């Protein structure tokens, strides 16, 4: 490895001469030659492109990749933190010093099985990178929300100008703190125009289903009705509408069930309430459709959907 200084001058501070040395071995005298030494001013190490601190400042960067900077309330966004480093240095250890608290967001850390080195291009330069953290966020406040910087302590090996006995490059280990930039999210409120009174904050794309485990039974029996919402959106952040039944049917508090997967793109799956219902008298009883309202951010509008109407036949009383 070689480096040159362009436009630099060496100023001679002094000149020294090392005189002859002699030694007598078995009657023979051996003499060394004189050596002239020029002492110059020290060249600042910061000018050297192989100085570890110079390499770190130029070739190490922590970036935060944000999927969307202007979402609606309760619309999912992702933030992925990547450590970029030059191919000429080796990262040997990483630790998180400071992390954002993601205030005013519902947040979920998306697990990374293991750190893997990949290649990318950033600002016209080639880098290695590791993905350090993935976060799924749902903004809970309209307006500007700041995501504070993340800071990592990075231990790296950088090449020096020195080589070992076998000609291999000698590396120098250094530790450096690197931070991402602050991220500003501008959250849009829900539109007030045509906003239904029944809207309770559900955002995404959903369907609603109602299903009874019995359509005909005796008055001394019970049956169950499951009211289920499926789709993609903020499934963990809203309530299922209540099931309305005729007054002659005794309805008990529902059992809630959640089957939701959380990934970098958001939540998807289903949530449901299962009601146990006991009839009091003989007859046919309609269980009316249940209305559910959600906001679709892609279509930028509110959508009303209905579950099926159910009819239960009580054959004796």
Indicate residue ranges for each PLM-predicted region:
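Surface-exposed interaction/ligand-binding surfaces
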Residues: 8-9, 13-317
């Amino acid at each position: 490895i070689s480096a040159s200084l362009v436009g630099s001058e060496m100023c001679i501070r002094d000149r020294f001469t090392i005189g002859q040395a002699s030694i007598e071995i078995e009657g023979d005298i051996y003499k060394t030659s004189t050596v002239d030494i020029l002492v110059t001013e020290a060249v600042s190490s910061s000018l050297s492109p192989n100085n570890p601190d110079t390499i770190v400042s130029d070739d190490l960067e922590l970036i935060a990749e944000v999927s969307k900077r202007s979402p609606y309330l309760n619309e999912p966004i992702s933030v992925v933190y990547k450590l970029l480093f030059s191919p000429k240095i080796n990262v040997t250890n990483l630790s998180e010093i400071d992390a954002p608290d993601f205030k005013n967001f519902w947040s979920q850390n998306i697990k990374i099985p293991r750190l893997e080195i990949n290649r990318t291009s950033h600002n016209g330069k080639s880098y290695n990178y590791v993905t350090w953290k993935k976060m799924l966020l749902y903004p809970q406040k309209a307006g500007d929300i700041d995501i504070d910087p993340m800071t990592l302590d990075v231990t790296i090996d950088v090449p020096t100008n020195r080589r070992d006995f076998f000609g291999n490059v000698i590396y120098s280990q250094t530790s450096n703190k690197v931070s991402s930039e602050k991220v500003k999210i501008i959250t849009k409120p829900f539109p007030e125009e045509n906003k239904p009174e029944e809207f309770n904050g559900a955002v995404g794309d959903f369907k609603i289903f109602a299903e009874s485990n019995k359509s005909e039974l005796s008055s001394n029996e019970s049956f169950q009705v499951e009211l289920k919402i499926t789709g993609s959106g903020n499934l963990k952040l809203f309530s299922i509408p209540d099931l309305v039944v005729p007054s002659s049917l005794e309805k008990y508090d529902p059992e809630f069930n959640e089957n939701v997967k959380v990934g970098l793109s958001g939540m998807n799956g289903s949530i449901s309430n299962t009601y146990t219902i006991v009839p009091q008298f003989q007859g046919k009883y309609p269980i009316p459709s249940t209305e559910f309202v959600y906001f679709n951010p892609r279509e930028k509008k509110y959508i009303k959907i209905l579950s099926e109407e159910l009819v239960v036949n009580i054959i004796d009383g």
